[in-house]
Amino acid sequence: MNIMIALIPALLWGTVPLIITKFGGSTRQQTMGMTLGALTFAVIVFFFTDPVYTLKTVGISFITGCLWTVGQMFQLRAFKIIGVSKAMPISTGMQLVGTTLCGVILFHEWDTTLRIILGFIALALIVGGIFLTSYAEKEEDGTNALKQGLITLVISSLGYVGLVVLIQGFKIDGINAILPQAIGMVLSALIMTHSGGTEKRFNKRTLLLIIPGMIWAAGNVAMVHANQLVGVATGFSLSQLGVVISTIGGIVLLKEKKTQKEMLYVIVGVVLVVLGGILIGVAKGA
């Protein structure tokens, strides 16, 4: 039963990119809708929990919210450039490599020979998965789009990795972080989406996009609960399975076109990224 609960974050997070893309809208509208959804859910959670706020908790959580918006906005841009089925495994892989290396360098997580061995195998699998997933048939337009998408995902991953490092470094409790983090998301989204497009940021589509924002936030709360039930290492590993839902959903539901060879590379790449993510979780608990 605990494992089933721990799979909820992967299920929720895996469906979010599909819902966002299906709803459509500009990157600005999607960013505002997502952050407003996260804030709405955070306010609801606030009334049903008993968070403890300190200056450090509020300040760091607010900053992580800003970093999340950077990560999310650039990830949304990547969806439009190279598609969900290609962007998600690459993004997940980059985040796994980034957070793992920061954990090793800053927090000395690989403190045994077994963890070092498992960790390097995991990184090799993830890097291999990224390489395979990013494969594109030699078409000039596709190659240029891939380069642009990769640059966009690097910026996105820097935001996400920075968020994780700050939360871990300052030992911020998940429940305590939710509301100030969501406030940081919305305020930074307002600033980042102020210019850069002619379309309105706030319309009916923006309101519709609040739904995936709430789903993401629900996954975040579920992750906090899952970690308490099965431990951080197992919870982290299981959360990586969401990329499978996003990738397959992008191909099947969103009808993202791929050649037979690209399809094979994507499937194998996703498997490698997931295995690498699970192995990182094993290394954390070893």
Curated annotation (Swiss-Prot):
GO cellular component: plasma membrane
Keyword field: Cell membrane, Membrane, Sugar transport, Transmembrane, Transmembrane helix, Transport
Topology in the lipid bilayer: Multi-pass membrane protein
Broad class of where this protein is predominantly found: membrane
GO terms assigned for molecular function: carbohydrate transmembrane transporter activity
Transmembrane segments: 4-26, 33-55, 114-136, 149-167, 177-194, 207-226, 230-252, 264-283
Alphabetical list of CDD domains matching this protein: glucose_uptake_GlcU
InterPro entries: Sugar_transport
Location within or outside the cell: Cell membrane
Assigned protein family: Belongs to the GRP transporter (TC 2.A.7.5) family.
Protein name, entry field: Putative sugar uptake protein lin0215
Source organism: Listeria innocua serovar 6a (strain ATCC BAA-680 / CLIP 11262)
